[in-house]
């Protein structure tokens, strides 16, 4: 990214302010010795004591003429043969090499804006910058990132680390509950086997001697002292009466259950609390990173994708921490413990089970690789459906007015049909896996049972224990597979989450050199292409022979001193992007924007924006809240009286106190507020901030509101004003006027200077357009006045007719009275 400077070093008399802006005379050092892979950065030093450049209008005009000539030459060169084109490319490469060789002498104003600055008071050290690889984040899709799985796991662990003691105690409780669950099958098997043995013994005695009648021995009549049995003894006695003499085993079962219950509670509570804490911090960092991204990032990414990252992906992370992680550890412990117990009981049967489990695991891995792309595709289609719903609901008025309901319905049905077709194959794969997995599980159980029978385990307690532990192991395998699936979703979601959290904004958000409050604003050979603003602009020199296709601004240079009024006119859309570059929302593709003598790429934009305000009805946003909250938005430290004073200056106070709750009345996007009143809220915000630089868009201001004109006239006093002019009075009061056409400045000067050239674009196009607008407005106003006068005349005639009718009625009534009196 290079440019040819258009600055002339002038004498001291031509420079209005020689003092360095905001930093006294202390030198500033930029250390650019960091190596980033193959990129070797040079060391650049500069001192603010040296004279700094300002723009010479004459040289800017000369450069404009040169650029026009260059464009003509480029057009001629495009008609030449391929050899000439090759020569041009070689010249471009040579020029690029020359410019790259001169980077050591260029001021740090031209430091590549992709670099991230560690701003300190007087020394800037680039060695601490943590660079983000260009391929680590895809600007246009959250579903295609090169974030590695290992890096995602490491980042998740960094968020878990502050809650480490929650997880330590949660895993301790989890281990105890798992041990209890491992002991239960052993106790149950012993109890059931003992009951079966006792019943078989009694049945054997009865069947061998049918003539012997066994009668219980009569209890002697002895008086004994009875005691109330404990709860444990009561439960044990009831169980014993049902299943035989298993008192010892059942006591252990009750003890295990009672021990397990509080640890189950602790496990769930600790995992849930830790999960909420981790996800809360993650969402905070995610939203903070989102707010610090440059505006062009939101231009190139869909709102629905960003909302899905904050809402859906973070919810997946929370579910994995609170549920899936616990399930993974629990099932792993149960699997390992169950296998160890089975090895202790019979190592031969255990080997058979392990062989079935290996087949199940391999099948799962193959299935996961097969179904994972389908899952990602379905997730992407779900996001598209969400976008259609958001757009349709948010723009329902426009859809209704344009009769576009059927079009939106067709789009929705198309996405639904695609989702339905994809879901059918996804469901078919899942159904196959569930049936195949169940077949493997049942085959494992049947194989173990058959092998155990062949090993003469059927007549011992080992067979029942084997079956119970086999069921536990297969259930653990199913739980492991489910938790691994959820963790795979977590990895996919965390790639999108951490790609956004770690993304370094192209336009720095905070920090930098603080400008003076009386700084001027200057553009030096500024080119801007919004389509390429997100990427490196290494190939810009190769694009010069393409007539600046796609450029919004081309070779724009001007300066506005403190207290001056600059007007921007012309049909080009470049005027709006002048505002965006001054606001620091974008960086220029080429060239430099200076605030004072400071490049916006190293400027403290946070401070500068506090001294800057834009009045444009199209950019005025009403937030959900009260009137007072909307006026003071971002300035919570101000008192209510400050709000009232600003509202009075904006001619808004009388309207607000007429509302049901005054300044506490709720407004927002869904409230039907008059556009004039919304504009007054914006003007009240400007009075409250008292900016030193005011950006004014007159193209959307109402012409017939005297209150708006009076409040703006009061606001612009003693301020630097840059206006997109649409009124003749504004042009007459301007210190300088820039006429834009075809994305470049074609004329400049005061109103009187530009008006003297009758054939100029300013006279033939701009003034005629403004006069036509005023004539139309005046004609409309005259027509309205004539209509009002006619209505008034008609009303007067009607009133006269009514008066005549009343007089006639009075005469008739008098005649009737006279006749009546005569008859009497």
From Swiss-Prot:
Pfam families: ABC_membrane, ABC_tran
Main location: membrane
Highest taxon above the source species: Eukaryota
Membrane topology label: Multi-pass membrane protein
GO cellular component, one term: membrane
Name listed for the protein in its UniProt record: ABC transporter B family member 7
Binding-site positions, ATP: 570-576
Renumbered residue ranges of the record's region Disordered: 41-101, 772-813
Bias type Low complexity, positions: 63-101
Domain ABC transmembrane type-1: 167-489
UniProt keyword Transmembrane, yes or no: yes
Listed transmembrane segments: 164-184, 252-272, 325-345, 347-367, 431-451, 461-481
Keywords from the UniProt entry: ATP-binding, Membrane, Nucleotide-binding, Transmembrane, Transmembrane helix, Transport
Family classification: Belongs to the ABC transporter superfamily. ABCB family.
GO molecular function: ABC-type transporter activity; ATP binding; ATP hydrolysis activity; ATPase-coupled transmembrane transporter activity
GO biological process: chemotaxis; transmembrane transport
Protein encoded by which gene: abcB7
The ABC transporter domain, residue ranges: 521-767
Phylogenetic classification of the source organism: Eukaryota, Amoebozoa, Evosea, Eumycetozoa, Dictyostelia
UniProt cross-references to PANTHER family, sorted A to Z: ATP-BINDING CASSETTE SUB-FAMILY B MEMBER 10, MITOCHONDRIAL, ATP-DEPENDENT PERMEASE MDL1, MITOCHONDRIAL
Compartments, record wording: Membrane
PROSITE patterns: ABC_TM1F, ABC_TRANSPORTER_2
Classification via CDD domains: ABC_6TM_TAP_ABCB8_10_like
């Amino acid at each position: 990214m290079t440019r040819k400077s258009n600055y002339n070093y002038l004498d001291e008399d031509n420079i209005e302010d020689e003092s360095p802006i905001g930093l006294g005379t202390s030198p500033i050092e930029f250390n650019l010795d960091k190596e980033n892979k193959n990129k070797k950065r040079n060391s650049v030093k500069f001192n603010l004591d040296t004279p700094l450049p300002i723009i010479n209008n004459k040289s800017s005009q000369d450069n404009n003429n040169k650029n026009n000539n260059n464009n003509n030459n480029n057009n001629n060169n495009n008609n030449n043969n391929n050899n000439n084109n090759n020569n041009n490319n070689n010249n471009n490469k040579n020029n690029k090499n020359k410019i790259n060789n001169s980077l050591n002498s260029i001021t740090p104003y031209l430091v590549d804006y992709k670099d991230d600055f560690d701003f300190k008071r007087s020394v800037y050290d680039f060695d601490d910058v943590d660079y983000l690889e260009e391929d680590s984040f895809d600007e246009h899709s959250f579903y295609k990132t090169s974030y590695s799985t290992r890096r995602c796991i490491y980042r998740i662990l960094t968020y878990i680390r502050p809650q480490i003691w929650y997880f330590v105690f949660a895993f301790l409780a989890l281990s105890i509950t798992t041990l209890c669950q491992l002991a239960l099958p052993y106790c149950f098997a012993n109890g059931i086997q003992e009951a079966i043995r006792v019943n078989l013994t009694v049945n054997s005695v009865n069947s061998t001697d049918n003539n012997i009648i066994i009668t219980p021995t009569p209890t002697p009549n002895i008086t004994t002292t009875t005691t109330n049995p404990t709860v444990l003894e009561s439960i044990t006695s009831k169980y014993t009466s049902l299943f035989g003499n298993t008192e010892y085993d059942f006591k252990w079962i009750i003890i295990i259950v009672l021990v397990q219950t509080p640890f189950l509670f602790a496990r769930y509570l600790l995992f849930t609390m830790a999960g909420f804490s981790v996800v809360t911090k993650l969402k905070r960092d995610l939203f903070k990173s989102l707010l610090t991204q440059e505006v062009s990032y939101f231009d190139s990414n869909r709102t629905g994708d960003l909302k899905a990252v904050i809402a859906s992906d973070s919810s997946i992370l929370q579910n994995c921490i609170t549920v899936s992680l616990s399930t993974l550890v629990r099932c792993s412990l149960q699997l390992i413990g169950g296998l160890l117990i089975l090895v202790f009981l019979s190592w031969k049967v255990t080997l058979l089970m392990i062989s079935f489990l290996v087949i199940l695991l391999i099948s799962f891995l193959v299935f996961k690789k097969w179904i994972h792309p389908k899952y990602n595709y379905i997730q992407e289609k779900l996001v598209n459906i969400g976008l259609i719903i958001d757009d349709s609901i948010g723009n329902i008025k426009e859809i209704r007015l344009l009769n576009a309901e059927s079009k939106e319905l067709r789009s929705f049905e198309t996405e639904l049909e695609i989702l339905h077709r994809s879901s059918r194959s996804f469901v078919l794969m899942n159904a196959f896996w569930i049936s195949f997995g169940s077949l493997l599980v049942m085959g494992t159980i049947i194989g173990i049972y058959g092998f155990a029978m062949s090993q003469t385990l059927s007549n011992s307690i080992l067979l029942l224990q084997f079956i119970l532990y086999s069921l536990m192991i297969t259930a653990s395998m199913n739980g492991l597979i489910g938790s691994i699936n959820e963790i795979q979703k977590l990895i996919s979601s965390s790639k999108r989450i951490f790609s956004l959290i770690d993304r370094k904004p192209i336009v720095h958000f905070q920090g930098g050199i603080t400008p003076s409050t009386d700084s001027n604003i200057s553009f030096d050979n500024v080119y801007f292409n919004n389509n390429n603003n997100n990427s490196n602009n290494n190939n810009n020199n190769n694009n010069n022979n393409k007539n600046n296709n796609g450029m919004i601004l081309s070779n724009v240079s001007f300066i506005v001193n403190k207290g001056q009024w600059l007007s921007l006119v012309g049909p080009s859309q470049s005027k709006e992007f002048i505002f965006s570059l001054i606001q620091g929302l974008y960086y220029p593709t080429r060239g430099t924007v200076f605030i004072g003598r400071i490049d916006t790429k190293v400027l403290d934009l946070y401070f500068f924006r506090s001294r800057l305000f834009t009045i444009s009805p199209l950019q005025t946003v009403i937030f959900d809240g009260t009137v007072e909250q909307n006026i003071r938005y971002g300035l919570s430290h101000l008192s209510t009286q400050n709000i009232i004073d600003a509202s009075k200056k904006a001619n808004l106070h009388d309207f607000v106190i007429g509302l049901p709750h005054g300044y506490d009345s709720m407004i927002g996007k869904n409230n039907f507020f008059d556009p004039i009143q919304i504009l007054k809220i914006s003007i009240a915000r400007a009075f409250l901030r008292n900016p030193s630089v005011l950006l004014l868009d007159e193209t959307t201001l109402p012409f017939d509101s005297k209150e708006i004109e009076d409040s703006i006239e009061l606001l612009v006093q003693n301020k630097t004003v840059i206006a997109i002019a649409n009124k003749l009075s504004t042009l007459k009061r301007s210190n300088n006027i820039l006429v834009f056409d075809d994305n470049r400045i074609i004329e400049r000067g005061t109103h009187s200077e530009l008006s003297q050239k009758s054939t100029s674009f300013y006279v033939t196009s701009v003034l005629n357009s403004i006069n036509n607008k005023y004539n139309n407005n005046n004609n409309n106003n005259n027509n309205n006045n004539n209509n009002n006068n006619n209505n008034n005349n008609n009303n007067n005639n009607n009133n006269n007719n009514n008066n005549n009718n009343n007089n006639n009625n009075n005469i008739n009534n008098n005649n009737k009275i006279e006749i009546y009196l005569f008859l009497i």
